Curated annotation (Swiss-Prot):
Ligates lysine onto the cytidine present at position 34 of the AUA codon-specific tRNA(Ile) that contains the anticodon CAU, in an ATP-dependent manner. Cytidine is converted to lysidine, thus changing the amino acid specificity of the tRNA from methionine to isoleucine. Its main location: cytoplasm. GO terms for molecular function: ATP binding; guanine phosphoribosyltransferase activity; hypoxanthine phosphoribosyltransferase activity; metal ion binding; tRNA(Ile)-lysidine synthase activity. Its EC number is 6.3.4.19, 2.4.2.8. The N-terminal region contains the highly conserved SGGXDS motif, predicted to be a P-loop motif involved in ATP binding. It catalyses: IMP + diphosphate = hypoxanthine + 5-phospho-alpha-D-ribose 1-diphosphate; GMP + diphosphate = guanine + 5-phospho-alpha-D-ribose 1-diphosphate; cytidine(34) in tRNA(Ile2) + L-lysine + ATP = lysidine(34) in tRNA(Ile2) + AMP + diphosphate + H(+). Disulfide bonds: none annotated. GO terms for cellular component: cytoplasm. Keywords: ATP-binding, Cytoplasm, Glycosyltransferase, Ligase, Magnesium, Metal-binding, Nucleotide-binding, Transferase, tRNA processing. This is Bifunctional protein TilS/HprT. SUPFAM superfamilies: Adenine nucleotide alpha hydrolases-like, MesJ substrate recognition domain-like, PheT/TilS domain, PRTase-like. It is found in: Cytoplasm. It comes from Listeria monocytogenes serovar 1/2a (strain ATCC BAA-679 / EGD-e). Binds 2 magnesium ions per subunit. One of the ions does not make direct protein contacts.
């Protein structure tokens, strides 16, 4: 074994690239690099010979493509190596995909490799990238302005669908590979396109690499060390960025939202790494769409004093900042649709967002207009009412203020995102007086109920269905879905140890504890029985009433049993205190309490849980079983509800 082979073996061991039970698919083009790699693996005894197979994709781009294919076939036939070949017209495929030749070739290659790996149950794809490729890649990315994570260059291994791609030749040079191929008399083809100065990589190879090697013969080892050190740094930073995104990211159908209130206070390097990670997620790990300029544009949006801004990113990705939220969504920009409706008495209109507006004569039983209604004195306005978009110069006469105020300033005060303002209905009377912008502001024409006057009432009904409006009611994600499941696994292990062999009666407190109980008991690995109680002191409010009611009692007897009570949250503690005392009174052998959330600031009785998932601040939290007026239980995370939602 010569020095070159020793360094490859050492590199494989250092990065744990190949294990004895791996099955290898070697990508072989017919050139010296990949044939040398195949020869090395075939003679290395790293894996049994029957664990090695070959894949070759004929791109049909060059005259000698058929010769290269024949070289691969001949080598494999002589050695008895299984090989898989596919021929693809890359030019035609590029036209149909509307992508460049190089990008299309890469996509098709990896699709082919992954297909073979899946069909043949192969877990490692072996590629022949070497030290020259590494230097070229790092320099190209630096000059092109790639995001900083690209500076680390080609990695020894990366995840693929159903396996890994590995690169054991990264520590050795092109010259060493040629020497190896000639030493072992390998017949290979030379890709004539590698000498063409039309390609960027070839210009770096021909003009920069010779200069660098002349300046410092140790340039290869220096770039190898640079790649490994920067990779380690980026991996550490990426772990922090991943945690940051888990706490501040909401995925809602086609839209992904980054919550900015705490995110923008993080250190700039962490923000940049988190944005890069987010873009990789959005672009499905295709880094070709991401440059450092895109990341800096987004960071500028986040740190700007302008609360409403928008930028277009590659592949029709749009980033919209709306005050403390940054929304990402693929698609075309929608031109604001203009609308204009006339509203006569007893008419009802429906807007594009499925909200509806209705005008009626005030009933004698109507005592209040509420937040979603407005009372008007008939003598002060002229019918029909007009429902339209805003227009430049709109002004509203304000209650308790002299003069009028620009609608634009009212929107800014209310923190209405710029891209949403043209969608809001502006209600005027027939003479043009602005009466109301539903959900934003009422004018000075808003009146109290009067039995003596003829009055109209406008009713605005929002479309509150659908997942989007539910997520938009959340001020901040407090505990992410991943954090919940990690804590539940931890609690499950503790409860398994506690109750092994005791067959406890597990009591779920309806309704809020149901999701928590369902996930938790999957993690408790011992026999148990389940029952439920529905005990409440809240109703549809946000503060405990102090009165505890049993809505559903247990079916099973607790006498002589070990009882574990599962609750979603301990707030005032009044409900749980009553329940625990009741179970003890019924002669349970033991009573223990596990709660997902504990809110000590709300406590007004003495009670402590035996097992606690998370301690939460004195905020109104919803999600994962917790509700407000029976809403939000199906959120997959724990979030803080916006105050305006429960104060309406």
């Amino acid at each position: 074994m010569d020095d070159t082979e020793k360094r490859v073996h050492k590199y494989i061991e250092k990065h744990d690239l190949i294990r004895s039970d791996d099955k290898l698919l070697v990508a072989v083009s017919g050139g010296p690099d990949s044939l040398a790699l195949l020869h090395f693996l075939w003679n290395s005894n790293l894996v049994p010979k029957e664990a090695i197979s070959v894949a070759h994709l004929n791109h049909q781009l060059r005259e000698n493509a058929a010769k290269e294919q024949r070289v691969v076939e001949t080598f494999c036939e002589r050695q008895g190596i299984p090989f898989y070949i596919e021929e693809v017209d890359i030019k035609s495929r590029a036209q149909s995909l509307q992508k460049g030749l190089e990008e299309t070739a890469r996509i098709v290659r990896y699709d082919f490799f992954e297909k073979v790996m899946a069909e043949k149950n192969i877990n490692k794809l072996v590629l022949a990238h070497h030290a020259d490729d590494q230097i070229e890649t790092i320099l190209m990315r630096l000059v092109r302005g790639s995001a900083s994570i690209g500076w680390s260059g080609i990695q020894p291994k990366r995840e693929l669908k159903g396996g890994q791609a590995i690169r054991p030749f990264l520590p050795i040079t092109k010259a060493e590979i040629i020497d190896y191929a000639q030493k072992h008399e390998l017949a290979y083809e030379i890709d004539e396109s590698n000498t063409s100065q039309e390609y960027t990589r070839n210009r770096y190879r021909a003009q920069l690499l010779p200069f660098l090697k002349q300046e410092n013969p140790a340039v290869y080892s220096h770039f190898e060390r640079f790649s490994e050190e920067t990779s380690e740094d980026f991996q550490f930073l990426e772990a922090l960025a991943s945690d940051l995104l888990k706490k501040n990211l909401i995925k809602n159908g086609k839209q992904t939202t980054l919550l900015l209130s705490s995110f923008k206070n993080e250190a700039n390097p962490l923000q940049r790494r988190a944005i890069h990670l987010l873009l990789r997620y959005l672009y499905n790990e295709d880094a070709s769409f991401i440059t450092v300029n895109h990341i800096y544009q987004i960071i500028q949006m986040i740190q700007s004093d302008n609360p409403s801004s928008s930028i277009d990113l590659p592949n029709k990705l749009i980033a919209n900042r709306a005050y403390d939220k940054l929304h990402f969504q693929f698609g075309e920009r929608e031109a604001p649709s203009e609308f204009y409706h006339q509203l006569e008495l007893n008419d009802r209109i429906e807007l594009d967002n499925k909200a509806s507006i209705r005008l009626k004569l005030k009933s004698s039983v109507v005592q209040t207009n509420g937040l979603n209604g407005m009372l008007l004195d008939a003598e002060e306005i002229t019918l029909p009412l007009i429902v339209r978009n805003r227009v430049n110069g709109d002004r509203m006469t304000m209650k308790g203020q002299a003069g009028s105020k620009k609608l634009k300033d009212i929107f800014i005060d209310a923190k209405i995102p710029r891209q949403e303002r043209d969608k809001l209905p502006v209600i005027t009377d027939y003479t043009g007086k602005i009466l109301w912008v539903p959900g934003v502001k009422k004018s000075a024409y808003d009146r109290e109920f009067s039995r003596s006057k003829k009055q109209y009432i406008i009713r605005y009904t929002r479309n509150i269905g659908g997942n989007e409006s539910m997520h938009n009611d959340i001020q901040k994600v407090l505990i992410s879905e991943d954090e919940l499941q990690e804590k539940i696994r931890e609690l499950g292990r503790e409860l398994t140890t506690e109750y092994e062999g005791r067959n406890p009666l597990v009591v779920g407190v309806l309704k809020g504890a149901t999701p928590f109980m369902t996930d938790l008991l999957k993690r408790v690995d011992t026999y148990l029985e389940m029952d439920f109680m529905d005990v409440s002191s809240y109703g549809n409010g946000t503060v405990s009433s102090g009165e505890v009611k049993i809505i559903k009692d247990l079916n099973a007897s607790v006498e002589g049993r070990d009882v574990l009570v599962i609750e979603d949250i301990i707030d005032s503690g009044r409900t749980l205190s009553y329940l625990v005392d009741l179970i003890k009174y019924r002669k349970a052998k033991s009573v223990k309490l596990v709660t997902l959330l504990d809110k000590p600031a709300g406590r007004n009785v003495e009670i402590e849980a035996d097992y606690v998932g998370f301690v939460v601040p004195n905020e109104f939290v919803v999600g994962y079983g917790l509700d407000y007026a029976e809403r939000y239980r199906n959120l997959p995370y724990i979030g803080i509800l916006k105050p305006e939602i429960y104060s309406e």
